[in-house]
């Protein structure tokens, strides 16, 4: 067991600034209006830094820097851009622990997840898109003896990116890596709840990227996010967040006829078929862990398996074992490597989760475990902690239909394959799903029948590069973490060339 020290305290691997300006043109820039907002850590609930409260003027300044940098960066040879991405990956890897501590203090997640998943995935995604870029090819089409069509991939230019608060670094990397690989300059707005860790990363890689290629502007959605998304000087906007906000982003982008990619909400079903319990073996234990994945990252995951659908024939036994597994989840200091579930990212989110627990109870759902705020005592007593909560109820209830974004799972039973698929698809969302079965035919048929962009089969919450990620229905547009994302940050130039000396003879 290792308990890392809080930033700025004796023995800590990192100190954070008492005030953060915006990162524009490769340097710190104070907000145009000179305003800042206090930022608390979810770990203790105490304020620890001030963050630039930016406006449209700061967005314009960042766009100036991005437009100044974009032409040269876009002309950089693919091999050189790939090498830059590789150096960024190396730098993250060299400072993994410092970045993990910053991420925990910013977001509240347990450091075991940041060290084992978030940061290694960030490293791998930069390396992946470096490789994808080197392997990308244009095309040549010979249309007839004298006419050839050449197709070139060209960067869009300057793009806007708006990042959520649940994975502040990893979600930023998911967007930055393909955008940079494609040759774009970026203006990025982090979530106001988690503005710090990305700025720590900017300082770490300042000597690697040309100034202005990445610019980070902090602030609130209406004051900084909207001026970015609606700005005619960006060629694309990428957004991860809540579905209603995603609709607004689409409206803003439509005014300038620019493309969007959106990764939005979810209410993911996790299906456990009867043969899961055919033996009490490693697979059964794996399935129980798959059930408990609703508590990963405190349930603050768009693909949180927040609806558990269990076959009627194994319902009581499997649910009993799942309850035991959930109650064994260790909640504690997020900086302790033994802690499995940390703090919610903000007090607002804490209150939202608690309100949904009240809603579920009022609807008649039964709380099987959890259902309350947790006071960890001492310096952690003001932190934003919720016990992992299991409801038993009906898929028509709000807790089954609405995204809670917390460590809350709603459980119901199904009677046969058709009933399982019907319940799974009875949702507005279609981001993720899980299927657990020992039967390959059931696994394949269920995976194809579920209306979701990512269906984990006998696994859950794996996010490797080269596996496309994105939603159906109200869960978004576009695919990330795959080479196809490079296309979202490029436009195709066609040169249609005639090598004949003779004209067509029309005039």
UniProtKB/Swiss-Prot annotation:
Keywords: NAD, Oxidoreductase. Pfam families: Aldedh. The keyword Transcription regulation does not apply. GO terms for molecular function: fluoroacetaldehyde dehydrogenase (NAD+) activity. The keyword NAD applies. PROSITE patterns: ALDEHYDE_DEHYDR_CYS, ALDEHYDE_DEHYDR_GLU. The active site is at 263, 302. GO terms for biological process: protein homotetramerization. Signal peptide: none annotated. NAD(+) binds at residues 219-225. InterPro entries: Ald_DH/histidinol_DH (IPR016161), Ald_DH_C (IPR016163), Ald_DH_CS_CYS (IPR016160), Ald_DH_CS_GLU (IPR029510), Ald_DH_N (IPR016162), Aldehyde_DH_dom (IPR015590). It catalyses: fluoroacetaldehyde + NAD(+) + H2O = fluoroacetate + NADH + 2 H(+). It comes from the Bacteria. Its EC number is 1.2.1.69. Catalyzes the oxidation of fluoroacetaldehyde to fluoroacetate. Has high affinity for fluoroacetate and glycolaldehyde but not for acetaldehyde. Belongs to the aldehyde dehydrogenase family. Homotetramer. PANTHER family: ALDEHYDE DEHYDROGENASE B-RELATED. This is Fluoroacetaldehyde dehydrogenase. It comes from Streptantibioticus cattleyicolor (strain ATCC 35852 / DSM 46488 / JCM 4925 / NBRC 14057 / NRRL 8057) (Streptomyces cattleya). The lineage of its organism: Bacteria, Bacillati, Actinomycetota, Actinomycetes, Kitasatosporales.
